[in-house]
């Protein structure tokens, strides 16, 4: 039961952060009105053509890290690295298609690649650490989802609008 609850909680966080940002805000991390976009990027690693290494590194590492908990949690249920990677790919594909279909953000092939990699890393790490840590991953996912919910509830009350600098 706890395994399914933790997976559902973390998946809800993932859905909220990838497809629902036009409908809420956490402080001044993003402007909800700027999140309604439909952009399709099919060229892998095109972020590197921008001239900066920081943007691509942040993007790719962030996508990978974002799916590692998902990989940990799915592996704790199915005990298969291959199935976990497939689930990571499937969820990422659904999120990317929803972003495009409903104009909720950028649909990027790199997201699909690095999200799947994150799920794979999470599964490999869960396998390496063994079952004794499965409850830890589950409770951490639930705690992270609870913190996220508090941040969403506090929303625009967080942060100082005078300290925001538009780049």
Q: Regions from the language model: what does each represent?
A:
Residues 103-129:
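Alpha-helical transmembrane segments that form the membrane-embedded catalytic/substrate-binding core
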Residues 1-103, 124-167:
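Bulky hydrophobic segments
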């Amino acid at each position: 039961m706890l395994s399914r609850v933790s997976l559902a909680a973390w998946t809800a966080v993932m859905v909220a952060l990838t497809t629902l940002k036009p409908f809420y805000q956490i402080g001044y991390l993003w402007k909800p009105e700027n999140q309604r976009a439909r952009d399709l990027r099919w060229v892998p690693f095109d972020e590197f053509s921008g001239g900066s290494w920081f943007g691509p590194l942040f993007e790719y590492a962030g996508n990978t890290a974002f799916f590692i908990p998902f990989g940990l949690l799915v592996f704790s249920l199915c005990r298969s690295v291959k199935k976990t990677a497939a689930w990571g790919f499937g969820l990422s594909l659904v999120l990317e298609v929803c972003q495009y279909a409903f104009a909720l953000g950028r649909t990027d092939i790199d997201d699909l690649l690095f999200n799947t990699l994150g799920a794979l890393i999470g599964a490999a790490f869960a396998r390496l650490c063994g079952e004794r840590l499965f409850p830890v991953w589950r409770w951490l996912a639930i705690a992270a989802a609870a913190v996220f919910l508090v941040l969403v509830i506090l929303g625009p009350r967080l942060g100082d609008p005078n300290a925001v600098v538009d780049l």
